[in-house]
Amino acid sequence: MATTAAPAGGARNGAGPEWGGFEENIQGGGSAVIDMENMDDTSGSSFEDMGELHQRLREEEVDADAADAAAAEEEDGEFLGMKGFKGQLSRQVADQMWQAGKRQASRAFSLYANIDILRPYFDVEPAQVRSRLLESMIPIKMVNFPQKIAGELYGPLMLVFTLVAILLHGMKTSDTIIREGTLMGTAIGTCFGYWLGVSSFIYFLAYLCNAQITMLQMLALLGYGLFGHCIVLFITYNIHLHALFYLFWLLVGGLSTLRMVAVLVSRTVGPTQRLLLCGTLAALHMLFLLYLHFAYHKVVEGILDTLEGPNIPPIQRVPRDIPAMLPAARLPTTVLNATAKAVAVTLQSH
């Protein structure tokens, strides 16, 4: 038994030639198992490669579909021709109209929202406006402390429009035929130009003179100061007397000017500053009333002559009888009358 086992063991160790092929197969099988164990696990990367490949295929399909759609649209546009161009143009016009309507709606909404900003400046009772109109004609005496100025624009704005209407009424009653648009524009430009321009100029001087007044207060003060101008022009446009105009110019216009001057004096420190500021305001305010009474008609008549030409009646030659007594020449009147008539007939024939 022992002797039999030894050759078997020796044969397993490679001593016997008959076991050579079997041992090679076993060794080959062992190397195969070891190689499989030592191989990298590439199964995950293989799935990732498949996913990327699938994604590329889908992208290529999408690009192909987009190219086909573009080609189809191009073919349709070429096939439709002018019809396709009109359709595209109509879409663009509709888009532009929509955008324009949207912008207008937003502007209207913003304008309505901005009305609330101006509402405090026009929120005033009629009784307050009436009392302020009367106070604008009464000069104040106490100028030691700053006088109160109404911070609203309803009364001044209505007075400016009233002055425009009075100017139009004056031109209606002056037997002057003009074009309504030209007259309206001239009157509005004159009144609003004076109100806004002089208020800005006086406010600038007040800033230089260190006066305690704001632009809103200056507009209100000068606007209520036009109440005297409205009274004077309304009366003198209906009663054409220069003496009456000068009387109202000094009394009514002077009272309204003194009221404004007193308010500015109470808000200005220093005699030189008071003289400069108040003297400028008084001169501009009184001269503006003179301008409205005298120069305004000439301006409108000049516009009328420019638009329609001067209205000059034609010259007519009419023979007249010479008076019976001529101190310079002692000639018979019958001879002179006959001679004059003959000359007139000769001129008319030519």
From Swiss-Prot:
Q: Which positions does the record annotate as the modified residue N-acetylalanine? A: 2
Subcellular localization(s) per the UniProt record: Cell membrane; Cytoplasm; Golgi apparatus, cis-Golgi network membrane
Tissue pattern of expression reads:
Expressed by nucleated hematopoietic cells (at protein level).
Q: Keywords on this record?
A: Acetylation, Cell membrane, Cytoplasm, Differentiation, Glycoprotein, Golgi apparatus, Membrane, Transmembrane, Transmembrane helix
Q: Which GO terms describe its biological process?
A: cell differentiation
* Low complexity composition bias: residue spans: 1-10
The answer, when asked if Transmembrane helix is one of the entry's keywords, is yes
Task: Tell me a GO cellular component.
Answer: Golgi apparatus
Q: Which domain of life is it from?
A: Eukaryota
Q: How does it sit in the membrane?
A: Multi-pass membrane protein
Q: Which residue ranges does UniProt annotate as crossing the membrane? A: 149-169, 188-208, 215-237, 241-263, 275-295
Q: Which family does it belong to?
A: Belongs to the YIP1 family.
What protein am I looking at?
Protein YIPF3
What is the species listed in this Swiss-Prot or TrEMBL entry? Answer: Homo sapiens (Human)
Q: Which gene encodes it?
A: YIPF3
